[in-house]
Amino acid sequence: PIVPIFNRPFLHYQIDLLKQVPEIDEVILSLNYQPRRIEEIFGDGSALNTKIRYVVEPVPLGTAGAVKYAGDKLTESVVVFNGDVLTQIDLAAVIRLHRERKARATIVLTPVQNPTAYGLVETDAGGNVTRFVEKPSADEITTNNINAGIYVLEPDTFDRIPSDVAWSIERSYFPSLIERRETFVAYIYAGYWIDIGTPEKYTQVHRDIMDGRYVTAPFLNMSA
């Protein structure tokens, strides 16, 4: 989260996106690696005109365990962001769909050319999530929509996540919603999205900013 994108730590861009939704009044950073370094950089969030709270996992808890550990005492809908995703999505629209559908969970899906490198997510005609297929083979591909690593969740569903053990949001928590026939809906987003988890993608982000494919404060369109 603190690798630089030009002159700013990557996490700045995610916080900028969250700040576009006025009702998001607190950012909780779930940390495990170098927590003090991250806290030194971002402080209490006042310099960014937001409120930041830090939660440090005692041991690695997995993607679902980390969400429960950070948000177990929350009572309102929670927006969850993977720490390596850069996007220009309209989060307010995602939250609006979540509320309109009275969903227990909403997942953002994004189309990619080759879902075999990720894991596809199947939905029905009503936009309900029906199945996850991790790193499918070519003959298993039924859609090119993948998990974009952005969710809106209801905290009272966290009770199914075990405490103090590593648990996966993709392999365990989400399938439990499907098994219980909870209202679990998808928001399809076809705009700019990238996972910067590889050196190649990290380099690509800089090119995208230079070429104007990704535009956000403090950047203007640098290709103009």
Where do the protein language model's features map onto the residues?
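A structural signal for short hydrophobic beta-strand segments in well-ordered beta-sheet cores
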Residues: 2, 121-123, 186
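Residues at the starts of beta-strands that form the adenosine-phosphate
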Residues: 25-27, 51, 104, 183
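Structural signal for interior beta-strand "rungs" in well-ordered beta-sheet cores
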Residues: 223-224
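Catalytic-core segments of class I nucleotidyltransferases/pyrophosphorylases
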Residues: 78-79, 86, 92-99, 113-115, ...
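Conserved beta-loop-beta/alpha segment of the NTase-like Rossmann-fold superfamily
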Residues: 38-125
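Active-site phosphate/pyrophosphate- and oxyanion-stabilizing loops and adjacent acidic/basic residues
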Residues: 16, 68, 175
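Short beta-strand segments
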Residues: 28-30, 82, 107-109, 152, ...
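N-terminal glycine-rich phosphate-binding loop and ensuing alpha1 helix
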Residues: 1-38
